[in-house]
Amino acid sequence: MKKYINKTEKILNENVIYLDLETLGLSKNSPIISASFTKENQIITYVLTNLKEEIELMEIIYKETRDKLIVTYNGDRFDLKLLKYKGEKYNINFEFKSLDYYQVAKKYSYLFESENLKQSTMEKFFGLYREEDIKGSQVIECYKNYLETKDEKYLDLIGKHNSLDVKGLIYLDRIKDYVEDKMSFFYENKKFLIKEINFEKDILYVEGKTNSNNLYFSNRVYEIKALENNFYLKIFTEKALYNKNTTCNYIFLKENFLKSQIESPENILVYYDHLVAQ
């Protein structure tokens, strides 16, 4: 294996590891040819010089990730599932506690003005533009070229790309603060962080975390209560015909929590709409 070491630009939590893998395909049988992860404020990258080294790489990953929170981008669906499968193959018992920033971005996708949720797109959303790098789709071609020519420049390209993926992953720590800022509101000088929003029978239900306890207030528009750092908000709506094709639920503009795409009349907030069946 060829090993690369790069310094991180921020001091990292020693109980957290940022991880990204490169493979020769998307199936569970595809060889893992490269792994990049953080350790002691460094980004460590290993690239296989031959496919038989995969088991050695799995043993390294197991040792480094054990008992740590693993941060990935789409890792819950790919990287970690693949490691589980490889662990069964090589008799390595992978157990993961993970944070997947792709799942966070997907859940709150309406907060991001971006064309898609690819890692590179989200990096640009937060202001990170990569230095010269190959595309992820070129990794397989590079490795095949290495196997044919034994020219290590191809390993270097893969190692750099893998390392930059982890560098970008660290940068995407900003997602947490961004989402918290966008999903928070203040009431009576207390902070409320929205975790769930549901709509049922003309009532909007909002739940989340707060630094307030033993709070209760209600009027004709909404009811809010807080207990043991959890809050529960119910917003009571009115339903009417917006035009001949669209009905809407609305409240008079007093408390603003959620807004529809369609234009609202003055002093009224339309926050849910749907087409009337033709």
Language-model segment annotations:
Residues 1-19, 24-32, 37-278:
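DEDD superfamily 3′-5′ metal-dependent exonuclease/proofreading module
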